[in-house]
Amino acid sequence: LTAIPHSEEGETVRKAIVTALLLALFAGTAWAQNIRIMGYGGNDPAIVVRLLEEVIGDELEAEGITLTYEPLEGDYNAALFNALSAGTAADLFYIPVETAPGIIATGKVLPLNGLVDVDPFIDSLVEAYTFDGQVYGIAKDFNSLAVVYNKDLFDEAGVAYPDENDTWETFADKLRAVSALDDDVYGACFQPAYDRFGAFALAAGWQPFDADGHTDLLDPAFVEAVEWYASLVQEGAAVLPADIGQGWTGGCLATDQVGVAFEGAWVLGFLRDEAPNLQYGATFMPVGPSGQRGNMLYTVAWGVNADSPNRDAAIRVLEALTSPEAQQWVLEQGLAIPSREALADNPFFDTGTPDAEANRVVFQGASDGNVAPFAFGTVGTAWMNPINDALVAVLSGQASVGDALANAQREMDTLLQR
């Protein structure tokens, strides 16, 4: 498999390298059908290359199939929409759940009914990609949020680790104890964005949409969640990532300045590489005022280009990428939770390692409490903008909760009326 960035720079050299690699890898193959894949940039090209080399490559090679991975750097969704519109999209591509309705509405995604067996996959994940009775994507994996914590900081503070019995109140007390260790130590890292905060709004009993598709940001439950979230930042028990030179809560955790981050299984590989000596644990999100935890489901599916000239081979690659063997490998690498229902009781979850325990928590978190998919209907990710702007304003001290949410509600109403 070859990863090719979308850039004109170095194109001749890159093509020569690609050709040499493919000839070397498939020298014994009389013919090879090349399947182009579009996915995320960042770490994903290396992950897919390893998956091919270590798990599914021999099988595909025997069938005369080669792969070219084309990472869409930057704004993946915008780049994919452009490629679909221009007719240059790959044979196979990621469909993030948060933008699935818009991607499918282009008419460029092949319905998979009768082409791929969806029965082995978790029902809720199949439903997330089902529109008008047609299945347009097979979830490659999924994630929910967990409380991932630095054991050493809690030990130093002489306070119990976060656990599944924590309420917002007991959880906050533990964060305060850790933050009391030093001026540059904080109990938690709070992302000023819906992709993490949303779990707390759900724990308060808030729902993103009512029966009419309206979003109420002045709902007392939502207001309560914002006030709780902001209060911990304002008193110094929590910190924003940017305030300690980080871009996300996983980066905060790796600094040894923060006791807790709210992340999915994607953080495990990062910690293994960036903080190999970190002694960490994981537990469930704290119970909110509703008496339930809150959480969100994050998933990405593989979709097939309806205009692909290599439809059968693309479907075969999709099946290989979502096979039990491939998903077992993804699980053991600490990257995500498998979407196949049969892997829910995988022995890996019970091996007792920190990675295994974190994966178990993330898996079980998907069905524990008030859980909503990280999806926003046809509005797409723009739905988060009013909420994110309000959180930034409140958590940075630029606006009161009331003023920020009133403004956010006006923006949300305008957005939903388009």
Protein language model annotation of sequence segments:
Residues 83, 90-91, 118-153, 185-187, ...:
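A structural signal for short loop-to-beta-strand junctions that line the ligand-binding cleft
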Residues 175-176, 214-242:
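Glycine-centered hinge/linker elements that transmit conformational signals in sensory
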Residues 101-108, 125-161, 190-211, 296-304, ...:
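Periplasmic solute-binding protein
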Residues 33, 62-66, 157, 231-238, ...:
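Extracytoplasmic/periplasmic substrate-recognition and gating elements
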Residues 4-10, 16, 31-102, 161, ...:
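Conserved N-terminal structural module of periplasmic/extracytoplasmic solute-binding proteins
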Residues 33, 332-385, 393:
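Long, aromatic- and glycine/proline-rich binding clefts that accommodate carbohydrate-like moieties
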Residues 96-146, 172, 277, 281-283, ...:
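Hinge/lid segment of periplasmic solute-binding proteins
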